[in-house]
Amino acid sequence: MKGTGKVVGLAHDVRAGTHMKLRATPSPAPEFQHGFATVDKYIPVGQAWLGAFEEKLWERLGLLTPGSSKVLPIFEDQYIASGGQIAELLSGRDRMVIDVRLEAYAEMGLDSASLCSHPYDLCTELILREAGGGVETPRGKPLRSPMDVTTPVSWVAYANPVLARRVRPVLRSLLP
């Protein structure tokens, strides 16, 4: 439903021959604690860089204190498909996904663009935007990539504008 901020789908039970409405509702939570927020790091290459990046992000957001024994109650959901991650945001389970593998690999001097997301991976981003969430570049700009199968894409998705406003300036400050 373009412009309404509401997304409704149908779930079909093929065995029973019934269906029911599914409403896509991203989390309205203004905080990350006790929720899922993920920095993508699927393969061994770049995990150290991405892990350090993630720790700095939580530190600068005031949610992690270096040297503290306090456990950060924020969970990861390393869902291997970008469309699946957007579905988790739409379901209300996840609050944020950051995919900056392209920046990590470039900073490490690696040509690993084939191991990053591509435009087709993000074909579901319009659904999240219509439901009230957001998908953008790590620098807070709209995604503007050619629709092909080779262009590497970095992206960030938020469940709601409150989280986006909180993270966006910190994220920009951490990027090379």
Residues covered by each model-derived region:
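An extended, acidic
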Residues: 2-176
